[in-house]
Amino acid sequence: MEQEDFNIREHQLTSRERDFENALRPLSFEDFSGQDKVVENLRIFVKAARLRGEALDHVLLHGPPGLGKTTLSNIIANELGVGFKVTSGPVLDKPGDLAGVLTSLEPNDVLFIDEIHRLSPVVEEYLYSAMEDYRIDIMIDKGPSARSIQIDLNPFTLVGATTRSGLLTAPLRARFGINLHLEYYDDDILSNIIRRSASILDVPCSVRAASEIASRSRGTPRIANALLRRVRDFAQVKGSGSIDTEIAQFALEALNIDKYGLDEIDNKILCTIIDKFKGGPVGLTTIATALGEDAGTIEEVYEPFLIKEGFMKRTPRGREVTELAYKHLGRSLYSSQKTLFND
């Protein structure tokens, strides 16, 4: 069977798949699997805020994509018993956009801003007073007739999510009273998440099949659930409708996702560094140009997992692949070094 290069991270969900995605999201801390330390701390912070009848301190959630930042934000609102509004940094283009969202919040509501590192500087400055003093100052008119009007806001909790916390300005970061980092999930927890999702989707899934999918899910629940949906398709068309180990392996191989969870782009990154740059070191921008990919996407989406799993490392001079990458790709590290010294 011809392999399909399926980039699970860039796959665009249909509206129906988005409904499935929402149906799979836990709605309470009790149902949320993984991130034990983060969840335990949030339980305490949320309970304390409820006992005081106050808005929860502003929360910053950071970590790689797909680890549950949006889900946790929704759970925070559910546990507080307040409203939940969602927006993102790129959408808030002007101060007026931010003002419209902030003035619509009821007391103690949760406002979730995804990709908060992508806020424009002018919008970010308006956010400072909103976070600290629950007010914003809006300029009316222009020129000599311009004047500032102060608008009081209801107390609220801002939950900011970012995959690139290093891009946050120091003043914005300092205004978050709660700062939490999300880690990759281990395979056992991912396997439990997959079995829970399979139950919600009403598709039988064996323990071993769930473990097989989990092992190729890059420690990421979003990827695990996306792979589950695709394996379910294969089970319905090529199998009996149930997901067992055999159909799971068949589907994942057809999707060109290897036993480490690496997909076509991951392997292209490693091959490019080896074949074109003799294993590195090489700069990120150079890698991106050679691949025709965005440097930010490589740094944010692909690189963290490759480094975590030991296929790549960062050095002061650039990115280098490791001996494990050579073994994984069936390449000879000695041959590469020999070529380097012969140049």
Swiss-Prot record:
The keyword Kinase does not apply. The keyword Lipid metabolism does not apply. GO terms for biological process: DNA recombination; DNA repair. Its main location: cytoplasm. GO terms for molecular function: ATP binding; ATP hydrolysis activity; four-way junction DNA binding; four-way junction helicase activity. The RuvA-RuvB-RuvC complex processes Holliday junction (HJ) DNA during genetic recombination and DNA repair, while the RuvA-RuvB complex plays an important role in the rescue of blocked DNA replication forks via replication fork reversal (RFR). RuvA specifically binds to HJ cruciform DNA, conferring on it an open structure. The RuvB hexamer acts as an ATP-dependent pump, pulling dsDNA into and through the RuvAB complex. RuvB forms 2 homohexamers on either side of HJ DNA bound by 1 or 2 RuvA tetramers; 4 subunits per hexamer contact DNA at a time. Mg(2+) binds at T70. Residues 186-256 are annotated as: Small ATPAse domain (RuvB-S). Homohexamer. Forms an RuvA(8)-RuvB(12)-Holliday junction (HJ) complex. HJ DNA is sandwiched between 2 RuvA tetramers; dsDNA enters through RuvA and exits via RuvB. An RuvB hexamer assembles on each DNA strand where it exits the tetramer. Each RuvB hexamer is contacted by two RuvA subunits (via domain III) on 2 adjacent RuvB subunits; this complex drives branch migration. In the full resolvosome a probable DNA-RuvA(4)-RuvB(12)-RuvC(2) complex forms which resolves the HJ. InterPro entries: AAA+_ATPase, AAA_lid_4, DNA_helicase_Holl-junc_RuvB, P-loop_NTPase, RuvB-like_N, RuvB_C, WH-like_DNA-bd_sf, WH_DNA-bd_sf. Keywords: ATP-binding, Cytoplasm, DNA damage, DNA recombination, DNA repair, DNA-binding, Hydrolase, Nucleotide-binding. Residues 259-343 are annotated as: Head domain (RuvB-H). One of its GO terms (cellular component) is cytoplasm. The lineage of its organism: Bacteria, Pseudomonadati, Bacteroidota, Bacteroidia, Bacteroidales. This is Holliday junction branch migration complex subunit RuvB. DNA binds at R314, R319. HAMAP family: DNA_HJ_migration_RuvB. It comes from the Bacteria. Belongs to the RuvB family.
